[in-house]
Amino acid sequence: MEMLQGLLLLLLLSMGGAWASREPLRPWCHPINAILAVEKEGCPVCITVNTTICAGYCPTMMRVLQAVLPPLPQVVCTYRDVRFESIRLPGCPRGVDPVVSFPVALSCRCGPCRRSTSDCGGPKDHPLTCDHPQLSGLLFL
């Protein structure tokens, strides 16, 4: 009987590994398509561009005794490989550089947020809002 219970336990544990290795219920950190609003101080227009950004879930941990121990560093979904593309904003006055660059995520990873290259804040209320009138279409360089 003990042998049968041991085999059953082994079978259940091996199947659990197969279940855990399948696609997660929530998408892990990966590049996704997104629309960004692009504008520049001194130029009277705003343009929306299609790009890829990093989004998804990263494993995090929290201490049970938060008051006693320091917090654990948390990771975020951030760029691994990125390239920058540029567009030219129309209607910029003389003396204002009309070229604006934006990131295109090539690959992503879970890691610490680098404030030097990323916005580490939470979700924005209105990510596509512009201070200037919005134009459709792109003027890539």
From Swiss-Prot:
InterPro entries: Cystine-knot_cytokine, Glyco_hormone_CN, Gonadotropin_bsu, Gonadotropin_bsu_CS. Gene3D superfamilies: Cystine-knot cytokines (2.10.90.10). Glycans are attached at residue 50. Disulfide bonds join 29-77, 43-92, 46-130, 54-108, 58-110, 113-120. CDD domains: GHB_like. Keywords: Disease variant, Disulfide bond, Glycoprotein, Hormone, Hypogonadotropic hypogonadism, Secreted, Signal. GO terms for cellular component: cytoplasm; extracellular region; extracellular space; Golgi lumen; pituitary gonadotropin complex. Its main location: secreted. PROSITE patterns: GLYCO_HORMONE_BETA_1, GLYCO_HORMONE_BETA_2. It is found in: Secreted. Pituitary gland. Pfam families: Cys_knot. Changing residue 18 to T: More effective in stimulating IP3 but not cAMP production. One of its GO terms (molecular function) is signaling receptor binding. Residues 1-20 form the signal peptide. One of its GO terms (biological process) is hormone-mediated signaling pathway. It comes from the Eukaryota. Belongs to the glycoprotein hormones subunit beta family. It is linked to Hypogonadotropic hypogonadism 23 with or without anosmia: A form of hypogonadotropic hypogonadism, a group of disorders characterized by absent or incomplete sexual maturation by the age of 18 years, in conjunction with low levels of circulating gonadotropins and testosterone and no other abnormalities of the hypothalamic-pituitary axis. HH23 male patients have normal sexual differentiation, reduced or absent Leydig cells, reduced or absent spermatogenesis, and absence of spontaneous puberty. Heterodimer of a common alpha chain and a unique beta chain which confers biological specificity to thyrotropin, lutropin, follitropin and gonadotropin. Promotes spermatogenesis and ovulation by stimulating the testes and ovaries to synthesize steroids. This is Lutropin subunit beta. The lineage of its organism: Eukaryota, Metazoa, Chordata, Craniata, Vertebrata.
